[in-house]
From Swiss-Prot:
One of its GO terms (cellular component) is ribonucleoprotein complex. Pfam families: Ribosomal_S21. The gene is rpsU. The lineage of its organism: Bacteria, Bacillati, Bacillota, Clostridia, Peptostreptococcales. The keyword DNA-binding does not apply. Keywords: Ribonucleoprotein, Ribosomal protein. One of its GO terms (molecular function) is structural constituent of ribosome. It comes from Alkaliphilus metalliredigens (strain QYMF). Residues 35-57 are annotated as: Disordered. The keyword Ribosomal protein applies. Belongs to the bacterial ribosomal protein bS21 family. InterPro entries: Ribosomal_bS21 (IPR001911), Ribosomal_bS21_CS (IPR018278), Ribosomal_bS21_sf (IPR038380). It comes from the Bacteria. This is Small ribosomal subunit protein bS21.
Length: 57
């Protein structure tokens, strides 16, 4: 879990901006999107193979 300490005289907007940046850097939202719906192992393999094919060309 990302956590920030609000500094003295820091606005809520700045604190929220720092929190969002920290979440993006740690990959929290990407992980949430990835785990939002269950993905069968066979589907994962197909996506991985397709990504490898796209990367190769």
């Amino acid at each position: 879990m990302s956590e920030i300490k609000i500094k003295d005289n820091e606005s809520l907007d700045n604190a929220l901006r720092r929190f969002k940046k920290q979440c993006a850097k740690s990959g929290v939202m990407a992980e949430v999107r990835k785990r939002e719906h269950y993905e069968k192992p066979s589907v994962k393999r197909k996506k991985k193979a397709e990504a490898a094919r796209k990367k190769k060309f």
